[in-house]
Amino acid sequence: MGRLVEAIIASILLSLCFTITKSAPKSALITNLPGFNGTFPSKHYAGYVAIDKHRNKNLWYYFVESERNASVDPVVLWLNGGPGCSSMDGFVYEHGPFNFEPKKKNSHLLHLNPYSWSKVSNIIYLDSPVGVGFSYSNDNADYTTDDTKTASDTHTFLLEWFKMFPEFQSNPFFISGESYAGIYVPTLAAEVVKGHKNVTKPVINFKGYLVGNGVTDEVFDGNALVPFTHGMGLISDELYEETKLVCNGTYYTGGQSGVSKECAGKLKTVSDTVNLLNLYNILEPCYHGTSLSALDIEFLPKSLLTLGKTEKPMAVRKRMFGRAWPLGAVVRPGIVPSWSQLLAGFGVPCIDDTVATKWLNDPAVRKAVHAKEEKAIGNWELCSSNLEYRHDTGSMIEYHRNLTLSGFRALIFSGDHDMCVPYTGSEAWTKAMGYKVVDEWRPWMSNNQVAGFTQGYANNLTFLTIKGAGHTVPEYKPRESLDFYSRFLAGEKI
């Protein structure tokens, strides 16, 4: 009897594997990648999904099948932030199947990444919204967008994608992302849940989501920096106590009445003290100059918060994302690592995106990944200079509350050396949800070492820090990231 059962199971698995080979669109299969000399550890696909055929509005994706068991492993959507930054950032610099190394004599650019998230999951890297990366529309009006439209368009993409890859419809599905994806992820999750209630087909087997160093709430995020700088030993006890006193412990007011002149002065002193540091990881050197910090928002003119609709967003190349801003503000995409950059347009410091930019603009690479030619849609930028983006959804706290109370699992993780979206803000808002603590603050382990700290709450909410990591956690701590990612997807204790 046992052998009969084993034979039946083997037959089912073989059938599933055959289905994967048969069902996935052959035209999307990637057969080679310039810079890589070897055999892919799993199948890769890329191409466009039309989310509005009439307008020729298309989102581009890169899909990596799991290296373990694609037929049953979770499908995970990855979204980088910005707003307006390509998710190929995650592919190239964080947790993709390859490590990109500067080309040396007689060597190749791409090498297999032992800590790729495709070791344990199928993963979709999506360029969203339209106008980002290789995604495009024939109607330039589509490059003016907002949180609500982005969530709706990405949900449409998912429905169409699962029709193209029907063999994955029964797999557990998770949404993940970092930085401004702290907005993208919960708003998209809410759309997916709404689709469930409306019995939208195909039904997406949504189980939960992960957010790394994510923008969440204007006030919580805005108040996070001063405690972070003090806790990290970046400002003196005296300056911290003086700032705390004159600001009454509140360093950002959400654009209501502002702060006092005395408070603004102390905040500027804090800003001046830390502004030579790498915003995205205070342990790392800063390569491209410096930037003022987020604290400057309190004493800069509010009139600088918006761009006029006729003003083209700045064509600057940058890598990171980050801080929330007042509801309704029109944003220069990709320029949100600090309020001062948002308002004054300084560009993003300390970051080098040369490898991704050169590789993805190589005509042979674009052809290999089924992306439009440069003459058709322009050059690939890590963060788009084509968008006008409006933040229109406000705080994400109620989104998280609704999702977790509905039974969906949530992991909020933070690199503890990120000064862009400090862990202090994420720790504060997860605690403010008011859920019962079911797993008290403790270290979590990776490779027999303390990798960070975690606290678990009722209703499937977990907060996690990663020791020594910056804004883009898997970039700095790849082994540890694969560990917590694997455990979360499997429903195991981290």
Swiss-Prot record:
Tissue expression, per UniProt?
Answer: Expressed in flowers and siliques.
- What EC number is given for this enzyme? 3.4.16.-
> What is the role of the protein in this entry?
Probable carboxypeptidase.
Q: Which UniProt keywords apply?
A: Carboxypeptidase, Disulfide bond, Glycoprotein, Hydrolase, Protease, Secreted, Signal
Which terms does the UniProt entry file under GO BP? proteolysis
Q: What is this protein called?
A: Serine carboxypeptidase-like 21
What family, per the record?
A: Belongs to the peptidase S10 family.
